Design a protein with these regions (language model features):
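Long, contiguous amphipathic alpha-helices that act as assembly "spine/axial" helices in icosahedral shell
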Residues: 1-26, 103-116, 165
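Glycine-rich, mobile lid/loop segments that gate access to catalytic sites or pores
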Residues: 13-55, 59
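Sequence/fold signature of self-assembling virion shell proteins
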Residues: 39-205
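A glycine-rich, acidic short-motif signal
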Residues: 7, 30, 191-193
Length: 205
């Protein structure tokens, strides 16, 4: 039981971060848009003034059966999603009947794990959500090129270099075939090693 409690505490950051990730289409980020959106504002001048254009980090196709996946740049100190640890996990027992009605009435000790933290959004530019879109070479290349072309205010190139694809578990082997094999159907696979693959049950839908 204590091992399970410890495991649950260790998984708390993943649970919170990925839960927030799945809410990104309906949760605002620092620029006033939903974190995943098709119209993030970018301004002509570096001070945030001048003509406004928009950029995207959301692709929505028409294939309702295609699982959602994400392409991410994790290289930089700032991340697309952030976990702030406030209190490290620690076992917290209740032994004293003077302080616990349950211990007093039932003569049973209680054990738990206490931890505190919070998940939040970082830079939307570092992650792209792809939904209702098949995981294919062509679709991945489009997203990667979109991310690499992102600019900040004043037209500054952001040098986004995606290095990870985050997939639900039912896309794990398809993603590994796309990024971990030298050939596909007898043809050189130009996407080999382009992205690392991370499959997580926390984003299964």
């Amino acid at each position: 039981m204590m091992e399970l409690a410890g495991q649950s505490a260790a998984e708390l950051p993943d649970d919170e971060v990925f839960s927030l990730l799945k809410k990104g289409k309906t949760t605002l980020c620092y620029d006033g848009q939903n974190f995943f959106d098709t119209d993030h504002p970018v301004f002509e001048k570096v001070d945030g003034t001048g003509n406004q254009t928009t950029q995207v980090n959301l692709t929505v196709g028409t294939d309702n059966d295609a699982p959602t996946f994400y392409i991410v740049d994790t290289r930089l100190p700032i991340k697309p999603l952030i976990w702030q640890k406030r209190t490290a996990p620690e076992i917290e027992p209740k032994f004293d009947p003077a302080k616990s009605e349950h211990v007093f009435m039932e003569d049973e000790y209680l054990w738990g794990v206490r931890a505190r933290g919070a998940a939040g959004f970082g830079f939307w530019q570092l992650i792209h959500r792809v939904e209702k879109t098949k995981l294919t070479k062509e679709n991945v290349q489009k997203v990667i090129q979109t991310m690499k072309g992102l600019k900040g205010d004043g037209g500054k190139a952001l040098n986004i270099q995606p290095n990870l694809i985050l997939v639900p578990t039912n896309l794990e082997y398809a993603a590994k075939e796309l990024f971990k094999t030298k050939q596909i159907n007898g043809t050189t696979n130009i996407l080999e090693s382009e992205l690392d693959v991370l499959a997580s049950p926390f984003i299964n839908e």
